[in-house]
């Protein structure tokens, strides 16, 4: 049955307008993005097929061009639209943490850092530099490593923090393996960074480890 033949309350577009995007399933949201299905399959049917083929929403969203276009019903035009949508989402979150914005929402910080790091195939270590009033100065990626390591030097981080006149930092790095549980090495480098920055009265407020669908906070664990 085509979507236009469904009861109005069950159609993805009408459902979104009535209840908001958060009320829709992954398949329904993807169906709106796809707009149309293929012969014998509605857009929602196709969306469900694609989620099954990719193994979920995240692998679909992070697929490269070749993998994306290998599925029936997708192509370069859809890939371009998807990449543009994802980048708009990242930039929207980034705009909420522009220079001078005060950090009033831990959830927003977590979402922003996740959007910047979770999709990366390599490990990256980043920092959010803040002034003494915890207003954003700058977000920077400090190092990029292999799939299992990233080099971070406390002396260089301290020098950068002083150059930006930062009063506090929030660190974040991703685990491409998808497991967000911090390693012993993660805890050691965080302590070294905290000790080095503490010599200049610069506080480390938190360190987030970003995994697949999970983010671990050092502050929430009582490690900072």
Curated annotation (Swiss-Prot):
Pfam families for the chain:
RadC (PF04002), UPF0758_N (PF20582)
Q: Domain of life here?
A: Bacteria
InterPro entries recorded? MPN, RadC_JAB, RuvA_2-like, UPF0758, UPF0758_CS, UPF0758_N
Q: Which residues form the MPN domain?
A: 102-224
UniProtKB keywords: Hydrolase, Metal-binding, Metalloprotease, Protease, Zinc
Report a single Gene Ontology molecular function.
metallopeptidase activity
- What family, per the record? Belongs to the UPF0758 family.
Q: What is this protein called?
A: UPF0758 protein Csal_2972
Instruction: Give the originating organism.
Output: Chromohalobacter salexigens (strain ATCC BAA-138 / DSM 3043 / CIP 106854 / NCIMB 13768 / 1H11)
